[in-house]
C-alpha cells in the first residue's frame, strides 16, 4: 500500500441523523467524495461519504452506515486519509504539504537550517515551519522570495532568510 495522505478531519456531530462536521484539507472540499472510501490513519476503517453540503467553514457530511447522532459522535476527531496515488498530479510550483514535511532546509549558501516541520496557513498565505537542530522553530512566508527552490526529489528546500532573521543569527554567533 502506498503512503496515506490526510485529506479531512471529522468534527462534532451535526443534527440527529448521523451527520458530522467535516473539515477538508483539499483545494476543492468536495473532492473527498471522488477519492472513494476514505481510511482511518491505521488503514483499518473505511468511510464512504454518502452526502456532503457546504457550511460556513466546513462541510456537513454523512457517511454510509452512520445513521444516528450517537454513531456520529464516536467519529469526532478521526482523521481521514487516501492513498497518495489517488490524489491528482500537482502543477509546477504546487506541492502537497505531505511531500514537503521532512525535507532538509538549507540557506542559499548551502548552510543547513533544519527540517521542514509543517506548512501552516493562518489566513494570509502559507507559512513554512522549519525546525533547526536546536532552538525555536523558524516560521517564514512560503513564497518564491523566501523559498526560491523546492527540490522534492532531492529532498531539500532552499531558503533565502529575510535580512531581519539573517541579521539576528549573525548577532548570536
Swiss-Prot record:
Q: Which keywords label this protein?
A: Chaperone, Cytoplasm, Ribosome biogenesis, rRNA processing
In its keyword annotation, does this UniProt entry include Chaperone? yes
Gene Ontology biological process terms from the UniProt entry:
maturation of SSU-rRNA
* Compartment(s) of residence: Cytoplasm
Q: Name one GO molecular function term.
A: ribosome binding
The protein's predominant localisation is cytoplasm
- The answer to whether keyword Cytoplasm applies is yes
Secretion signal span: none
User: What Gene Ontology terms describe where this protein resides (cellular component)?
Assistant: cytosol; ribosome
Residue ranges of the PRC barrel domain? 92-165
- InterPro entries assigned: PRC_barrel-like_sf, PRC_RimM, RimM, RimM_N, RimM_N_sf, Transl_B-barrel_sf
The record's note on its domains: The PRC barrel domain binds ribosomal protein uS19.
Q: Provide the assembly information.
A: Binds ribosomal protein uS19.
Q: Give the protein's function.
A: An accessory protein needed during the final step in the assembly of 30S ribosomal subunit, possibly for assembly of the head region. Essential for efficient processing of 16S rRNA. May be needed both before and after RbfA during the maturation of 16S rRNA. It has affinity for free ribosomal 30S subunits but not for 70S ribosomes.
UniProt similarity note: Belongs to the RimM family.
What is the recorded name of this protein?
A: Ribosome maturation factor RimM
* Species per Swiss-Prot/TrEMBL record: Bradyrhizobium diazoefficiens (strain JCM 10833 / BCRC 13528 / IAM 13628 / NBRC 14792 / USDA 110)
Give the gene that encodes this protein. rimM
